[in-house]
């Protein structure tokens, strides 16, 4: 009787047994993955286009926004009887030779005055030219303006466009500090359908770009002085919870 002896393991390879997923597992993984993708696609725009106003006496609008946002800001101002409408914005970066206004704050304020049906206390708050972090620089300029008037208000509401809202609120809150609560109103971007943003190039560029920009602002952003001669010290980064 010949006894079979197992082949000894080789020098370079050896046999192993391993478990692999069955087709049922792959189907479940596919369904879960598709559900996750769908959740991101349908949920990212509502997440970014945050609307959460507070009871405030001061309304702020970003001066670079289009006419629909400006009209909505005027409607909000009249409906809730604010005392002041402030317009933020840095230098106009194109067509300066054809534009009578040096900054978006001044341009936006003039635009609002033309739109208003009666006299509204509109004040432009220009920001200096910067190479990066323009939204934050306009928020710092607003903080400096408040301090020159006396002290920042306890609450403000900020009006901006679509998915820019959550990032704007975060950066304005960082710049103004915890002494001022920042409410936010997001006005739909007329360039794309917010419920089907992925069907247009404008929607894809805007939503994906704003998501990446918000992720950077919420995790990596470190403020730097916006001008060498700033008389007001910049606040340290204190990112509020839930932004």
List the predicted regions and their residue ranges.
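N-terminal intrinsically disordered, acidic low-complexity segments at the extreme N-terminus
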Residues: 1-10
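N-terminal type II signal-anchor transmembrane helix
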Residues: 10-50
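Juxtamembrane/transmembrane-helix boundary motifs in multi-pass membrane proteins
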Residues: 16-21, 197, 201, 205
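A structural signal for short, hydrophobic/glycine-enriched beta-strand patches
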Residues: 45-199
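Bulky hydrophobic/aromatic packing residues
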Residues: 64, 79, 212-213, 242
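Short, charged low-complexity intrinsically disordered segments located at boundaries
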Residues: 173-174, 201-205, 240-243
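A transmembrane-helix-recognition feature enriched in membrane-embedded lipid enzymes
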Residues: 200-227
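Short linear elements at protein peripheries
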Residues: 224-243
